[in-house]
Amino acid sequence: MTTSTLTIPAADVPNTPGGGPSCRADHTHIAAALGAYTQSRSGFAVLPGPARHALLEIGDRLAGLRDALGPAESASGRDPGPHRTSESLVAPVLHDAVYPQLDMLGREIGFAAPATWRAASRYFHDRFGALVDLSPVAARCFHKPLGYAGDFEMMNMIYRNESLGDTLFGRSLSRVLLDSQAGQAVRHRAHYLAGKITAAAAHGTPHRPARILSVAAGPAMELQLILRHDPALLRAGRAELTLLDQDAGALRHARERIEALAAQAGAAMTLRCTNTSIRKVIAEGLTGPYDLIYSAGLFDYLKDRTARAAGARLVAALAPGGTAVIGNFGTANPSRPMLELILDWPLHHRSASDLRRLFGDFGTGMTIEQEATGINLFAAISA
């Protein structure tokens, strides 16, 4: 009996399981993908049944609208004028398609379970993230390229109020987010704070200017508004302004914009920038005294204990008769489910009674104020 042997060149040997480094690398990637899938599914499984249905319904409605708009957009061309008109037609339809389901999610999950919202948001973006990313506004919120929510460029997007996106669906989703009551509240609070700054500057003189500090300043849009529309008090040298932020990029951006606007307005003003964190402020305090200290959105991210410690430092740095203004989104924010699920932008919402509990014993007195929508509250504390 004759036995023949067939020799196969090494290059022709199939890459069978366990057969080499590339296969092991493939196994590693596959295992990671399966682990992510399992984690995502387990997060979905903890949701109440109606919440699971609402989440999937939101994704399905977004996908359906995106698919329906594609052919219509191709037929309409790329002229900006029709685009603006088209967004005004599409955005209300998109809003009405998803907001009832978002409201249902809010009722089913509640807001005492942040881990459940994180699980829901993770699953939603695993399934439907490609749709959400068609809106640059939503994409920046969710992906957080600077490592945290509400960075200065994100706030600029809200302040500029432009429907960004390469597709009609993406621009319409941006419009829905920007027109949300939370988006409106952010823009209104800039005007509210501009009023506080103007009032403080009115009591300053060139010899003793009002000293004003913005904590977590971001783009400092409230100062930009004053310089664009009512620069007279700043032109007279009645205010010294200090911007404090943990993000050096935010401070550079704010300084460039404010100095350019001040030059256009002929405003003689002193502007200082301090690059530090709220942790350091809590640990070391602030170098005062200031006639007005305000923080627009920082306290939305602070737990109660940290918020109270930070508030104490702000009030301690006030001059006699000065005011500290602490902003916080109120619990009656109808945009909260959208923030939690689609944008992964959780905040510590607080009621007026919550603010009184945290800061009511500071200074000589406190009032609770609000911007025009009534969604963003402010604790105004007198020294």
Which functions belong to the PLM regions below?
Residues 2-108, 180-184, 188-200, 206, ...:
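Class I (Rossmann-like) S-adenosyl-L-methionine-dependent methyltransferase catalytic domain
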Residues 295-298:
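A short beta-strand submotif of the Rossmann-like class I SAM-dependent methyltransferase core
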Residues 283-293:
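A short acidic, Gly/Pro-enriched loop at the edge of an enzyme's catalytic core
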Residues 213-216:
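Conserved S-adenosyl-L-methionine
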Residues 134-136, 293, 333-338:
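Short acidic (Asp/Glu) and glycine-rich catalytic loops that position anionic groups and cofactors
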Residues 300-302:
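A short His-aromatic
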Residues 308-323:
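A short glycine-rich, Lys/Arg-flanked "PGG" loop and its adjoining helix->strand segment in the class I
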Residues 92-204:
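Conserved Class I S-adenosyl-L-methionine-dependent methyltransferase catalytic core
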